[in-house]
Amino acid sequence: MCIRDSTYRCLANDVLVEKKIPVNPIWQEFFEYHTSQDYFKTVIKLFEKYMPNYKWLEQQTARIRNTQGDTKVVTDTQFVVHQPYHTTTRTTHIDNPIEFYAGLLYFRQRGDRSSGGDFMIYDSPEIKDVYKKKGREIPENISIKDHTSVPYKENTFVMFLNSNKAVHGVTPRVDASVDRLSVNIIGEYTDRSACTFRLRPID
């Protein structure tokens, strides 16, 4: 279990290996598949024409993050709970370069009458500098434009390939009184030398 500020994360290792979090068989199967070699290969195939190193990735054997094993890639699936805040907990940013894909599956709760909490995708130039202490938030002088808004809605899924143009964020929730629920599905490198882009941290 990982807790940061107002966000709680339950990792695949907690569910599948350490058995710290009891889940019903449906969720057990969900976590097993979305951290599996089959799913990893499916995602690589989906994005292959956008990945300069996809042939190398196809040859890798994935393991669950935070487990033992000699591999260059890891996968994770996470329950994520964001407590209700009137400001966004995720401004425009780029994910860690060690991540090469990410998916988000939303589970808006019945009775959630808030607005906002939508996933925003932006058009942007290639980003080189980020505020590392602010979660790789991009500088204010970078010109970005709204591209796509994915509503915070039950059973809504969005997936993206991480790059130095994959700028995204979450709109503020208004009148939020219940938690914002989602599942993250992630693929990462274990060695930063494999990353396809770099970000310079700025204060």
State where each predicted segment sits.
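Catalytic core of non-heme Fe(II) oxygenases with the double-stranded beta-helix
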Residues: 40, 53-200
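Non-heme Fe(II)/2-oxoglutarate
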Residues: 4-55
